[in-house]
Amino acid sequence: MKQGIFMIKQQIEELRQLLRHHEYQYHVLDNPQIPDSEYDRLFHQLKALEQQYPEYASENSPTQRVGAKPLSNFAQVKHDIPMLSLDNAFSDEDFFAFVKRIQDRLIHVHHSLTFCCEPKLDGLAVSILYINGQLVQAATRGDGTTGEDITANIRTIRNIPLQLLTDNPPARLEVRGEVFMSQAGFEKLNKTALAKGEKTFANPRNAAAGSLRQLDPKITGQRPLMLNAYGIGIAEGVELPDTHFARLQWLKSIGIPVNNEIQLCHGIEKVLDFYRTIKQKRSSLGYDIDGTVLKINDIDLQQQLGFISKAPRWAIAYKFPAQEELTILNNVEFQVGRTGAITPVAKLEPVFVAGVTVSNATLHNGDEIARLDIAIGDTVIVRRAGDVIPQIIGVLHERRPENAKSIIFPSNCPVCDSVISKIEGEAVARCTGGLICAAQRKEALKHFVSRKAMDIDGIGAKLIEQLVERELVHTPADLFKLDQVTLMRLERMGAKSAENALASLAKAKKTTLARFIFALGIREVGETTALNLATHFKTLEAFENATFEQLQKVQDVGEVVAKRIRSFWSEPHNVAVVKDLIAQGIHWDDVEVKEVRDNPLKGKTVVLTGTLTKMGRSEAKEYLLQLGCKVSGSVSSKTDFVIAGESAGSKLTKATELGINILSENEFLALLA
């Protein structure tokens, strides 16, 4: 018996130590190692044991306090009124139990309860003190009793007023709220960090917490932080409204930001409707939330209900299903996207996350695999938010099994066996078999027949879908091998449509070298670059055999584009398809290099608008490109010339308003003469 009691006592102490460790990682180091759901499970396990064995209760247990101790780097601030956390509900039944506890304490209240309902922002709780309307101090929640002085950092947040917008400010007003970062701001912050080679943040909450705890306020000021107030602590020299909702509206009226989704809900069903609505809107809000906060609206009733040691009795956080969970990485497969991007896909032990069972998650690229230091067999943290593809955001390395296997990134495409290429400085590796890779086939063919490439009118996107799905076309060269009988077997393809398609294919065999190069779909080789390559090398053979150094001598061809071109030609599959295309009769006239004299249009940004009667728009564009012009599709202050044909519309009007040089078709032709 004694041994059993000893083991229970030991289990309780181990749980306390484990929870303290994770609190320190989360609150102090801003480096959470487990999902919130895992922490909640450990917390409730400890709480249940302490309730079952009260003789082992301890005032220092994680269940008896709000959070972790503050950092020693900041001055400490004692909260006059403790900043408590909230009890959690994870189901309707939990919420009903919360309501019953309230009703049992308010037996004299016979009307239905009214709640102030708010989204539960996933950020950092702060206290901001105003004296006579001036912001004088700000602190983190810390352990609920003592926080960290972050006044200088809070002053840098643009949506927090340094002076209240009222002519009659309170003598003292303590505003409590959540500092957070929008998803767009978070993505921009990480993108900038990547470009500078700096460490990125795992999620917006970590980014907000890390930004708010910077010792240098200038760094905080560069971060896109925001505040939403959720309550009031101290208030002196002011008569506050007698409901929570009205108090939030009053805060808003004096310049304090309040969340726009907050609603007043009368009765339990309306509260649950709010929960479901916010849950549905979650992915479109633009910021992270992990549930709703439901508060008794009447301040008098709040005071009657009071507090327990850790939380108010009049409020609860009804949390959404966990967006992060632990599971095992069983394997990694490599998928090929429509542009040839190679994406590692984690095959997971199925786990229920955010309302669905997840068995696959993206690992993004090889750099991400290295950053995570992940191996097959690892225990991983998988995250699913809204409609975003599940992803692995962390690894519990201490749980790595002895038989864990390293993840080997393939050197050849798993679909077509072409070489995989990765440009230095880029994260994404790509298959080089663009013309033959089945994974890229549809997009490669759609590009090949497009108007700016081979301009094959009779072959549209829907026809290509059918041709590929029925395995009738594998490469662009196969298009020219189609016959009428084959085409007429397809949906919505009668004799006339088949004839038109074949006629378009026959007509397209006569093209230009520039169009042909563009049609090959070499990554980074756009219409202008293709024309520059054709003009420079003059023949397909010279272009195919050009060295890396020779390619870089071409206008607009830098190191990256040159590498893309050499990767394309070094893949035997691509060379074979090009030879097949020539064998099918694709041809062009010798490249005529027009002499580019000094010309007012040379190197300028030009917009074509209206109908040109003496020259087709494509021909006009080709002339302009040979002059080194940038041909744009829209008019802006950066436009140098607008060439206006007949029936020119809004582009001509805008050019006139901006004072841009306007040329008629005849004036344009005169400059080319």
From Swiss-Prot:
SMART domains: BRCT, HhH1, LIGANc. NAD(+) binds at D36, S37, E38, Y39, D40, S85, L86, E118, R141, E178, K295, K319. Residues 596-673 form the BRCT domain. GO terms for molecular function: DNA binding; DNA ligase (NAD+) activity; metal ion binding. Its EC number is 6.5.1.2. One of its GO terms (biological process) is DNA repair. Pfam families: BRCT (PF00533), DNA_ligase_aden (PF01653), DNA_ligase_OB (PF03120), DNA_ligase_ZBD (PF03119), HHH_2 (PF12826), HHH_5 (PF14520), Nlig-Ia (PF22745). Zn(2+) binds at C413, C416, C431, C437. GO terms for cellular component: cytosol. It catalyses: NAD(+) + (deoxyribonucleotide)n-3'-hydroxyl + 5'-phospho-(deoxyribonucleotide)m = (deoxyribonucleotide)n+m + AMP + beta-nicotinamide D-nucleotide. Its cofactor is Mg(2+); Mn(2+). Coiled coil: none annotated. Keywords: DNA damage, DNA repair, DNA replication, Ligase, Magnesium, Manganese, Metal-binding, NAD, Zinc. InterPro entries: BRCT_dom, BRCT_dom_sf, DisA/LigA_HHH, DNA_ligase, DNA_ligase_AS, DNA_ligase_CS, DNAligase_adenylation, DNAligase_N. The active site is at K120. NCBIfam families: dnlj, PRK07956.1. Belongs to the NAD-dependent DNA ligase family. LigA subfamily. DNA ligase that catalyzes the formation of phosphodiester linkages between 5'-phosphoryl and 3'-hydroxyl groups in double-stranded DNA using NAD as a coenzyme and as the energy source for the reaction. It is essential for DNA replication and repair of damaged DNA. This is DNA ligase. It comes from Histophilus somni (strain 129Pt).
